[in-house]
Structure formats: structure tokens, C-alpha cells
Amino acid sequence: MSKKKGLSLEEKRSRMMEIFFETKDVFQLKDIEKIAPKSKGITPMSVKEVLQSLVDDNMVDTERVGTSNYYWAFPSKALHARKRRLEELEKQLEDGSQRKKALQQAVDKAKVGREVNEEREDLLKELTALKGQRDQMKVEIEKYQECDPAVVEEIRNANIAAKEAVARWTGGTFGNYLISYLLTCSLTRQEPWAHHLSPSSGFSPGTACQTCYYYQQAIS
């Protein structure tokens, strides 16, 4: 034979409440410890624990008289206790429903504008195209950095250094004139210096061939 299954806590609580309802009497703990095992099958070791759980839930009343504690519970008391408990559960259910509704509204609001549609796809394509144009403009800006004042100043300083180097080579007034001319052409026309030494530029160095030679050596 299989071993008989013991009572659950709720079953013990229910059977102990039957003791109070059937007798409509007041008991001490020692009285319940005698009655519960015999009439309701509640183990003696669990009587005190079950009784205290009923007191904690306001299903059983208790009062200390002298050195003894007395316990009682009437059907009307249990009815009111169950009614209060039912009201608490209904309130919790209502609060939970309201919370669920608020969360669902928040979720629906968050979804607005994220649904996939033709207009959204077109906007995404336009955004991608604009990003591509932005990247292309960055490349173009890098190409025109020569027009930046800082870059021009850097070129000017390099030209001055080159002029001084050529002056050291030529050591003459004509060399300075030649370099000044070339510097002016380079900055205003943004063309290489060597271009202004060619015959097509209209410049005729004449007897300054040696000077031109030193100049080309200096800038090469």
C-alpha cells in the first residue's frame, strides 16, 4: 500500500476553522492541540503553526487573560475576513489591469512612426543619398584647402625661405628682382614657379641666364 499523503497547509487551516465554527466555543492552545489531531487529522506538531497563521490573517481572534491565551472564531468573523480579502484581491486586480493598459498605450505610442511603409522607405533612401552627398562635399572641401588662409600663409612662408636660399646663391639685385617677380606670379595665379621661366610666359631673362640656372637649382 502506498503511504497516505499528509494534509497541505491550506487543508489544515480549513479543518481548524471547522473546529471553531462547529463548536462556536473559546479555546486555549492546549485544548486545540488535543482536539485537532483526533477530530481533524492535524498532526500535533503543526497545530500551533496553523493556529498562528489563522491569527495572522485575522481569521481567528485571540486575547490574553491572565497567563493564558484564548482563541475563538465565529462564522460572521470569517465571512468579514474573507470579504475584506476579496476586496483586496479585486483592488489588486484593478490596479494590475490599469497598469497593463497604461503599458500597452506606451508601447503603441512608441511604435508610431516605426511601422514599415512606402513613405518611410522613401525618407530612408533620401537620408542615405544626403549622407553620400555630405561625404562627397567633404572630399571637395579637402581639394580646396589651398584657399584656406592658413594654407596660403604656409605657402608664403615656404616661398620666403626659398627666396632667401636663392639670394644666397645669386647674391645680386637682379636675382632678388627675379624671385620677387616669380613669387608674385605664383601667389596670384597659383601656378608653378618654373612655368614663369618658360618662353611662353613672356618673360625674357636676357643676360640673367646664370641667375635662372641658380634659381632652378634652388627650387628643384
From Swiss-Prot:
Q: Which UniProt keywords apply?
A: Coiled coil, DNA recombination, Meiosis, Nucleus
Per its UniProt record, what SUPFAM superfamilies does this chain match?
Winged helix' DNA-binding domain
Is Transmembrane included in the keywords of this UniProt record? no
TM stretches of this protein: none
Q: Pfam families from the xrefs? A: Mnd1 (PF03962)
Location, primary (coarse class): nucleus
Q: Which GO terms describe its cellular component?
A: nucleus
Give start-end ranges for the coiled-coil region(s): 76-147
Q: Name one GO molecular function term.
A: double-stranded DNA binding
Where in the sequence is the signal peptide annotated? none
Q: Which GO terms describe its biological process?
A: reciprocal meiotic recombination
Keyword Coiled coil part of the UniProt annotation:
yes
What subcellular locations does the record give? Nucleus
Please report which protein family the annotation says this sequence is part of.
Answer: Belongs to the MND1 family.
Role noted for this protein: Required for proper homologous chromosome pairing and efficient cross-over and intragenic recombination during meiosis. Stimulates both DMC1- and RAD51-mediated homologous strand assimilation, which is required for the resolution of meiotic double-strand breaks.
Q: What is this protein called?
A: Meiotic nuclear division protein 1 homolog
Organism listed in the record = Danio rerio (Zebrafish)
- Give the gene that encodes this protein: mnd1
